[in-house]
């Protein structure tokens, strides 16, 4: 399976509050339109495996660019003083330019993506909460290095028989230290995939290689140094891709303190 697609990513757009149960667990309001934010591409980290070793980084560096094959294998870094939450999501990989799309049908999603991937939208929850209370942007809470763990791509040919109902065939799972925490079908999304693509395109042009995270189901929880994370993407209950990460203390001087 390939990670080369990551080299073409110019932006990562994340849909928030797209599962009712997740909205309820965080006591948030339900948006009438798809609500989104951005993550930097420097937050990308890819899984370790028997054939991949940690990327060699300069001392105290937590990102040194993607490798030639698109990988950036390493751990999830937990910054000091930060309460990090996992949010498992289906990722869409955009395959063509989309701008000012007035209407999109469900079956048109297939031709607009090159495939899907499994991703974690990691969130510095206490950093985000403080920013919200002060009415400040909360980009940093989503954008730390390694806060975008992502799998190899699953090519769209894998699900070519389901062009009209992609919304209904996927399921995402996240386990921490062997305990299942998140498990949700994409059929539970409040805003469907075609609406997400169409809506974003009216404000921000989508380009080939862009990554769109489509929201997380209920069950978000904290990650701590030493934790082992296992995530799965299923198609009609069959595993099509998974990923594993270990959590470590983040090197460097950063430490979050409430002000």
Curated annotation (Swiss-Prot):
Principal place where this protein is found? mitochondrion
What is one GO biological process annotated to this record?
oxaloacetate metabolic process
Which InterPro entries does its entry note?
Fumarylacetoacetase-like_C, Fumarylacetoacetase_C_sf
Compartmental location:
Mitochondrion
Q: What catalytic activity is recorded?
A: oxaloacetate = enol-oxaloacetate
What the record says about the induction of its expression is: In high salinity conditions.
- Write down a Pfam family by its short name: FAA_hydrolase
Coiled-coil region(s) = none
**A single Gene Ontology molecular function, please?**
metal ion binding
EC no. given is 5.3.2.2
Q: What are the UniProt keywords, alphabetically? A: Isomerase, Magnesium, Metal-binding, Mitochondrion, Stress response
Cofactor(s) annotated in UniProt: Mg(2+); Mn(2+)
Q: What class of enzyme is it?
A: isomerase
Further information in the entry reads: Present with 2550 molecules/cell in log phase SD medium.
Regarding protein family, the annotation reads: Belongs to the FAH family.
Name of this chain's protein: Oxaloacetate tautomerase FMP41, mitochondrial
Species the sequence originates in: Saccharomyces cerevisiae (strain ATCC 204508 / S288c) (Baker's yeast)
């Amino acid at each position: 399976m390939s990670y080369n697609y990551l080299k073409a990513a110019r932006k990562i757009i994340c849909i928030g509050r797209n599962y009712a149960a997740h909205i309820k667990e965080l006591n948030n309001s339900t948006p009438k339109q798809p609500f989104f934010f951005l993550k930097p591409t420097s937050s990308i980290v890819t899984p370790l495996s028997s054939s991949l070793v940690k990327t060699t980084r300069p001392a105290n560096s937590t990102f040194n660019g993607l490798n030639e094959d698109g990988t950036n294998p390493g751990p999830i870094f937990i910054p000091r003083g930060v309460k990090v939450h996992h949010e498992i999501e289906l990722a869409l990989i955009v395959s063509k330019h989309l701008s000012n799309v007035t209407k999109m049908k469900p079956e048109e999603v297939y031709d607009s993506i090159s495939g899907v991937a499994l991703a974690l939208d990691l969130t510095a929850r206490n950093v985000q909460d403080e920013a919200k209370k002060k009415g400040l942007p909360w980009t940093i809470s989503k954008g730390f290095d390694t806060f975008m763990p992502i799998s190899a791509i699953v090519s769209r040919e894998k699900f070519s028989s389901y062009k009209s109902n992609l919304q209904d065939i996927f399921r995402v799972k996240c386990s921490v230290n062997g305990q299942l925490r998140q498990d949700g079908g994409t059929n539970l999304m409040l805003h469907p995939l075609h609406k997400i693509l169409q809506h974003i395109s009216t404000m921000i042009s989508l380009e080939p290689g862009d990554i769109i995270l489509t929201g997380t189901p209920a069950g978000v929880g904290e990650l701590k140094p030493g934790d082992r994370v296992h995530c799965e993407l299923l198609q009609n209950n069959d595993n099509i891709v998974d990923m594993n990460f270990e959590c470590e203390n983040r090197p460097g001087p950063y430490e979050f303190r409430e002000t």
